[in-house]
């Protein structure tokens, strides 16, 4: 049967596996072995931009790295410890250093500015002195030591992001040991470890990821967060069709999650790809889907 999407221009599409190393894909693009690549990471972005005849494209997304704390594991079962971690983080600095500023600053509630129901809350303020005071109130006047797992499952920016948090948190007396794991090994423990960075993909609605990741008892609730009030307010948001009214309700939802300090979520990141300049109509998709229905070769 004819393709439902109308006329297409390519006769054939071939995928070549260059392995997990982004530099191998860049080399294949530069040499002409391939016409385009699947993804372009931050470490290879500048290289691609300098290759003659190569065009880099970018998509603004809700993809993000969530440095979440499991609320059922010590010391994160103490809300004040979680609040201290959040208060010590400089999310804007994290975006700048870990992702070249390519994205938007996160607000620790996993809803992005590009989501239609996003509600703007008062800006977060870093307060190292307050973070220290919270630790003392939680029973850690001399600071606390924790280990954060990272698998670099979507690139080394994950490790860089945790490194920035480590340096921020040290000022407040929080000593973070970074446990870098193979990506396959990370996915074996991602929803079990007390403290980890997990890369979450883009979803078109903010309510979607909140239901997947923070609703009580759902399989992907890696933080172990369990708050009936949050669940009820999220139910209300999901029941509202009018976007303007849903924004008002989402302000309540976002604030609950932010106040409970479940995560440090430094930024939402832009994603990139690259292609030869004779490849027309090839664009980066927020979820990295390949859509070749309007791609053609000049």
Please place each PLM-identified region on the residue numbering:
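Ligand-site clamp/hinge motif
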Residues: 1-47, 166, 175-177
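Short, solvent-exposed loop/beta-turn-alpha elements that line the ligand-binding surface or hinge
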Residues: 2-11, 46-59, 68-79, 112-130, ...
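Structural recognition of the beta-strand scaffold that forms the well-ordered cores
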Residues: 14-17, 35-39, 56-58, 65-68, ...
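Short, hydrophobic alpha-helical packing/hinge segments within bilobed ligand-binding/sensory domains
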Residues: 24-26, 34, 44-45, 81-82, ...
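Periplasmic binding protein-like
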Residues: 36-39, 161, 166-215, 249-250
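Append "and occasionally in soluble cytosolic enzymes with long acidic Gly/Pro-rich linkers
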Residues: 50, 57, 77-167, 226-229, ...
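Bilobed periplasmic-binding protein-like "clamshell/Venus-flytrap" ligand-binding domains
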Residues: 137-155, 198-201, 241-277
């Amino acid at each position: 049967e004819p393709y439902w999407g109308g006329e297409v221009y390519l006769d054939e599409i071939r995928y070549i596996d260059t392995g997990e190393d982004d530099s191998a894909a860049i080399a294949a693009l530069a040499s002409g072995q391939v016409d385009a690549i699947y993804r372009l990471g931050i470490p290879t972005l500048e290289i691609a931009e300098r290759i003659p005849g190569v065009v880099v494209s970018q998509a603004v997304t809700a993809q993000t790295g969530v440095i979440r704390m499991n609320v059922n594991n010590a010391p994160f079962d103490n809300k004040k410890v979680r609040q201290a971690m959040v208060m010590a983080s400089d999310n804007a600095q994290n975006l700048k250093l870990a992702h070249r500023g390519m994205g938007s600053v996160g607000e620790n509630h996993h809803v992005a500015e590009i989501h239609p129901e996003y509600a703007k809350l008062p800006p977060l303020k870093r307060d190292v002195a307050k973070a220290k005071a919270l630790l003392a109130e939680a029973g850690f006047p001399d600071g606390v030591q924790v280990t954060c797992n990272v698998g670099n499952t979507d690139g080394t920016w994950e490790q860089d992001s945790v490194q920035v948090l480590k340096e921020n948190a040290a000022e407040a007396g929080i000593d973070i040991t970074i446990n870098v794991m193979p990506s396959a090994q990370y996915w074996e423990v991602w929803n079990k470890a007390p403290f980890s960075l997990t890369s979450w993909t883009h979803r078109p609605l903010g309510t979607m990821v909140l239901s997947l990741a923070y609703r009580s008892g759902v399989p992907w609730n890696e933080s172990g967060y369990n708050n009936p009030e949050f669940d009820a307010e999220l139910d209300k948001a999901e029941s509202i069709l009018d976007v303007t009214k849903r924004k008002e309700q989402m302000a309540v939802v976002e604030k609950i999650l932010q106040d409970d300090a479940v995560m440090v979520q430094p930024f939402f990141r832009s994603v990139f790809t690259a292609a030869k300049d004779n490849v027309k109509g090839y664009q980066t998709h927020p979820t990295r889907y390949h859509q070749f229905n309007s791609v053609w070769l000049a």
